[in-house]
Design a protein with these regions (language model features):
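N-terminal leader/signal peptides at the extreme start of proteins
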Residues: 1-32
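Amphipathic alpha-helical segments typified by the pilin-like N-terminal helix
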Residues: 26-67
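Phosphate/pyrophosphate-recognition segments in soluble nucleotide-handling domains
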Residues: 15, 22, 38, 106-112
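Short, well-structured segments within or immediately adjacent to enzyme catalytic domains
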Residues: 65-252
Length: 252
């Protein structure tokens, strides 16, 4: 038997307490259908937001990559100013020759001289260079969109490579060249770029398409620009070599 409530000053008996509580609980709880509707709405919103968040992340990574390349460009021009117009060398890509270069702080390769200009730790001091489990962190060496890591027995990881043809040879050489001696406008001469391999130098076939099916390039004048894959890649080992806005080999 349920107790009934009578409102003070009222002539009528109120609803029974048991009936009132039962009615309250029935109205306050979600039905299965209502719960499924809520879940469906959340799923739809998540599906709408994920692409937006993904694009925002990609844009942030691209921005950081561009900033890295601009810093390398700035370091290059400071180096040129301090070294009688001479550019740093492209160096050597892998193995024992690279290691011998890294052990020589006076060697003129870009990966030795430019960090010094920027007052950054030397490349040989980077823990991720030999340890694929090391935290990459935020570094001018690292493009946040590049997932490449060290794979044993490799001892190097370059997310950015220097164009092997800027001196006109198309191969790594060990004689420095002056910026003013390059017969092509510095605004179109490729300097550093997003590296799809791991050596410190490369050509059009080394570029990686990690920024919305494109890549970032720095040029000898210091500016940085993103190009679509179709502008530098044609499926060959060296990529497109006749794009006037991306000059790889500076001497005819």
């Amino acid at each position: 038997m349920f107790a009934c409530l009578v409102l003070k000053g009222s002539q009528k008996t109120g609803a029974c307490l048991g009936t009132t509580l039962s009615h309250y609980h029935l109205r306050s709880a979600f039905t299965l259908i209502e719960l499924l509707v809520v879940i469906a709405i959340i799923a739809i919103l998540a599906a709408m937001l994920l692409p937006v968040l993904s694009k925002a992340k990609a844009a942030a990574q691209n921005s950081q990559c561009i900033n890295n390349l601009k810093q390398w460009g700035l370091a290059t021009h400071i180096y040129v100013t301090d070294n009688n117009d001479f550019l740093p060398l492209e160096g050597r890509g892998t193995g024992t020759p690279l290691q011998s270069d890294l052990d020589n702080p006076t060697y003129q390769a870009w990966y030795i001289q430019l960090p010094e200009v920027l007052k950054l730790p030397r490349y040989v001091e980077m823990p991720w260079r030999t340890n694929d489990a090391a935290n990459l962190g935020r570094s001018v060496w690292i493009c946040p969109a590049n997932q490449r890591r060290v794979v044993a027995p490799s001892i190097n990881l370059f997310h950015y490579a220097l164009s092997v043809g800027f001196n006109g040879t198309g191969t790594n050489q060990h004689s420095p060249i002056k910026l003013s001696a390059i017969p092509v406008a510095p605004t179109v001469v490729v300097w550093l770029f997003d590296n799809g391999q791991k050596p410190a130098l490369g050509d059009g076939g080394s570029v990686t398409n990690i920024h919305n099916n494109g890549a970032n390039f720095s040029f000898l004048d210091g500016h940085v620009k993103r190009f679509n894959k179709s502008e530098y890649w044609n499926g060959t080992s060296v990529g497109i070599t006749n794009n006037p806005d991306l000059v790889w080999n500076t001497f005819p």
